[in-house]
Amino acid sequence: MTKKIKCAYHLCKKDVEESKAIERMLHFMHGILSKDEPRKYCSEACAEKDQMAHEL
C-alpha cells in the first residue's frame, strides 16, 4: 500500500503518492529571519506558486 500525502501548496491540497511527490526547498521570511524548509508538492507548478506566494 502506498502512502498518500497532501500537496503543501495551500490552494491545492491534492493527494499524491509520497514516492511521486516533488520535494523542494521553500525559502521564506519568518519574522526577520530567512528560513528554508523542505516541502512536498504534487507538481512543479504548485512548488513555483507556493514560492511566489511567500516572496516579499
Curated annotation (Swiss-Prot):
Tree of life domain: Bacteria
One MF term in the entry's GO annotations: zinc ion binding
Gene3D superfamilies with a match to the protein in the record: 1.25.40.820
InterPro entries, alphabetized: Rtr1/RPAP2_sf, YdaE-like
Protein name according to UniProt: Uncharacterized protein YdaE
Source organism of the structure: Escherichia coli (strain K12)
